[in-house]
């Protein structure tokens, strides 16, 4: 990088520029239980040594700047600086390295995902000495975890609220996502819930547009929920999207949802922002609302393998900021998601303690202590033939969400919901009887069609539909 140039002054300060690795590359450092640990995929510019690049990341995401400054002498740089404590090559990538960086906990405001990300994934991602930079994983120390409320309620409380156990929950995104009037929208919600689904959902870009203002949608959806509950005897819900242009408008919508008595609201946490999301999560905890999270915009951040931020980091951040559900990919549907990587961050969402496992992309052991878990939502291009695989991959603590796979049924919305509920119940029963969903899945569905004409019709419509593309996000081998 820049040549070393130093100028002595009468007060002992040495001005000029020095290599980052002299201060920020510390391979002998022993990490502390209170450190936030980060694994960065670093692609240095030609001629920049990996140690210098790693130290540059540590410096620029903590206390460093491009030149030596005299005010360094007014604080304990050794106490507050980030440290690159390890560099390892990436298999099959000659120009990429994994740089491990430790950050002292005092660099971060308590319970503020916004502040954590501003430092760790801030200006450093535009640093000229790096061709590309990707944050692969974070280890959040328990001391920092305990400063967060986390999900509004968590998995067990949600099941208790809904009185639904022993199976995945079923959902449906109302389609077309834009253009319906509030009354027609509410009609579709009712038909899906009446047919056997647990939830219906606003699409992520349904806010308050001219064709359907938010208050009208909330009222018609609440009417649909109560009517379906009365007819089925089951607790139902619709994810009312409270995302808005200002935090004040977002909270106004959440308050109105609570006044209507509905069980759940929704937020687009990346486009809405972490500050707004945490504010909404706190309100939901205090007022008995579940909070569904959509990850719109995530692929802008996480899809490129050499630059950006892996979704497992965004998933951890969401668990800290707060949300009871989050979309996580399907493995088998139309959206990106390799199986082992997906299951890795699904465990990070649901479990209390997750061991380091590089075969699933998990770089650090993570202990969430008492932070509630988040239900992963499998959604995007799935239909009844996928039900065995989804049940086997995601297990009971998940939401399986079929939009087109419900509303595209040839007989209508309610029969589409019936088909999905029958398929799910058949898969759960078969699994509980000891059958292998991975190998017997199609046969289990075919058997169920014999006593469900709705399922038989759905199977016929979607029998040839597959999404067979190579995943962009793959493990390093």
From Swiss-Prot:
Q: Can you state the subunit structure given in the record?
A: Heterohexadecamer of 8 large chains and 8 small chains; disulfide-linked. The disulfide link is formed within the large subunit homodimers.
Pfam families reported in the protein's UniProt record: RuBisCO_large, RuBisCO_large_N
HAMAP family recorded for this chain?
A: RuBisCO_L_type1 (MF_01338)
Q: How is the cofactor bound?
A: Binds 1 Mg(2+) ion per subunit.
Please list the residues that make up the propeptide: 1-2
Please name the GO terms of the biological process aspect recorded for this protein, alphabetically.
Answer: photorespiration; reductive pentose-phosphate cycle
Which UniProt key words apply to this protein?
Answer: Acetylation, Calvin cycle, Carbon dioxide fixation, Chloroplast, Disulfide bond, Lyase, Magnesium, Metal-binding, Methylation, Monooxygenase, Oxidoreductase, Photorespiration, Photosynthesis, Plastid
Q: What is its main location?
A: plastid
Give the EC number(s) listed in the UniProt record. Answer: 4.1.1.39
Designated name of the protein:
Ribulose bisphosphate carboxylase large chain
Q: Which NCBIfam families match?
A: PRK04208.1 (NF003252)
Which prosthetic group or cofactor does it need? Mg(2+)
């Amino acid at each position: 990088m820049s040549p070393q140039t130093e100028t002595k002054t009468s007060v002992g300060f040495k001005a000029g520029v020095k290599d980052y690795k002299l201060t920020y590359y510390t391979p002998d450092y022993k990490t502390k239980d209170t450190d936030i640990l980060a694994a960065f995929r670093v692609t240095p510019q030609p001629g920049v040594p990996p140690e210098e690049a790693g130290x540059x990341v540590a410096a620029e995401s903590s206390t460093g700047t491009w030149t030596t400054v005299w005010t360094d002498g007014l604080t304990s740089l050794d106490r507050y600086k980030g440290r690159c404590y390890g560099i390892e090559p990436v298999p099959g990538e000659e120009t990429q390295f994994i740089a491990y960086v430790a950050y002292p906990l005092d660099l971060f405001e308590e319970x503020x995902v916004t502040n954590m990300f501003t430092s760790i994934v801030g200006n450093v991602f535009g640093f000229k000495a790096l061709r590309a930079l990707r944050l692969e994983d974070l280890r959040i120390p328990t001391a920092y975890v305990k400063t967060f409320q986390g999900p509004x309620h968590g998995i067990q409380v949600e099941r208790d609220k809904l009185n639904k156990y022993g199976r995945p929950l079923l959902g449906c995104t109302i389609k077309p996502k834009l253009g319906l009037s509030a009354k027609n929208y509410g009609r579709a919600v009712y038909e899906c819930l009446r047919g056997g689904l647990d939830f219906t959902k606003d699409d992520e870009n349904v806010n308050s547009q001219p064709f359907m203002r938010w208050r009208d949608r909330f009222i018609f959806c609440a009417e649909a929920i109560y009517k379906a509950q009365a007819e089925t005897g089951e607790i139902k819900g619709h994810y009312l999207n409270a995302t808005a242009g200002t935090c004040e408008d977002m909270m106004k919508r959440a308050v109105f949802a609570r006044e209507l008595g509905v069980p759940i609201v929704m937020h687009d946490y990346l486009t809405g922002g972490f500050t707004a999301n945490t504010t909404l999560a706190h309100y939901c905890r205090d007022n008995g609302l579940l909070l569904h999270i959509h990850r719109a915009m995530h692929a802008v951040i996480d899809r490129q393998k050499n630059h950006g931020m892996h979704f497992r980091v965004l998933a951890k951040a969401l668990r800290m900021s707060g949300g009871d559900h989050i979309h996580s990919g399907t493995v088998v549907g139309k959206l990106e998601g390799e199986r082992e990587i997906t299951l890795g961050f699904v465990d990070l969402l649901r479990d209390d303690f997750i061991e380091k496992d590089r075969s699933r992309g998990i770089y650090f052991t993570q202990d969430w202590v008492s932070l509630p878990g988040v239900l992963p939502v499998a959604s995007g291009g799935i239909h009844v033939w996928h039900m065995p695989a989804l049940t086997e991959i995601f297990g009971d603590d998940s939401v399986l969400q079929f939009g087109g796979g419900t509303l595209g049924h040839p007989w209508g919305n309610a029969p589409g919901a019936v088909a999905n509920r029958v398929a799910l119940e058949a898969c759960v029963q078969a699994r509980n009887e000891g059958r292998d969903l991975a190998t017997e899945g199609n046969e289990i569905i075919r058997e169920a069609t014999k006593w469900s004409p709705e399922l038989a019709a759905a199977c016929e419509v979607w029998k040839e539909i597959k999404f067979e593309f190579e995943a962009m996000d793959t493990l390093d081998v």
